[in-house]
Amino acid sequence: MYNSPTHLRLQAKSGWVVFELAGKKRSEVKARISIHVKGHAAISPARAPFGSIEMYSRISHAALLNFFQFVEAGLRQNGVKQLEIKHWPASYQPFQAKQVQQVLAHKLHFAVTEEVSSVIPVGASTLRMRMKPSERQKARKSEKLFSFSCCAPGEYKTMYDFIQACRTERKQSLSLSWKEMRQTISKFPDRFVFFKLANATGVAAAVIVIRVSDKIWYTFYYAHAAKYNKLSPVVHLLECIYARAASEKVKLIDLGTSMLQNKINKPLLHFKESIGAVTGPKFTFRKSYE
């Protein structure tokens, strides 16, 4: 989604350079990377959780190296002196992610920054089966107290405001304003799903899910009301989302990174692992040119 022409225009209206690796047939595209250039700086993405290269079929190590060398040469001819590539979580496509890392870090000598990313593989078993005992207990209690539902579009603003209020209570902020969020949803109405846990007294927890692809869901924003901190209803909310994802043949639920001021946010990472998430790397590659 993030590399689609529509989303690229939301990130920045102009300044995009797109490189493609063609297959044997003229119409075949084996890989593509969209890079935003402003002055002497180039970045992929301009404004999204990740950008980087999209690989549509298996590519040899040599072909991938040649492609990135072509990208570098093209950017340098246009006066680029700094390049940053924010890669997708390695868990999305482990083999391809390793290929990209080997080419950029080892062959082309990009500097590498590693973040910790957490994903939940979706399978036949319930998420509760993977949880630690303490989290299972929270899930059982929340199941008795709250009802799970998918929100109608008319509720989106209310859910956004709820999540924002929860973040404000914790002295945190959201990366997108409601205006920006609404604009993105209007362009991708089928990609956004809002879920909530609620009872007669109101909303206890909410989440905004992005369908990154047919096989991957990304929990973009989620939160629960501070008065439920001990109960942590987000645990039950996530297991409900897991069940919904399984019914739609989704393979991965991306819980995002667990970083705070460029360091691992250990309490957040512990929470994600305690509910059944698997930890992996998410790389950002940087290089300067003379």
Please report, for each region that a protein language model flagged, where it lies by residue:
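Conserved GNAT acetyl-CoA-binding A-motif
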Residues: 78-90, 246-257
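Well-ordered, non-membrane alpha-helical segments in soluble/globular domains
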Residues: 63-71, 98, 178
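Short, polar/flexible loop-turn hinges at active-site or ligand-entry regions and domain interfaces
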Residues: 57-62, 125-128
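A conserved beta-strand-loop-helix scaffold within acyl/acetyltransferase catalytic domains
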Residues: 1-42, 87-228
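Aromatic (often tryptophan-rich) hydrophobic motifs at membrane interfaces
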Residues: 32, 65-70, 187-290
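Acidic-and-aromatic substrate-binding clefts and catalytic sites of carbohydrate-active enzymes
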Residues: 61-62, 91-97, 260-264
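A short glycine/small-residue-enriched secondary-structure motif
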Residues: 38-54
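Short, charged beta->alpha transition segments
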Residues: 68-75, 106
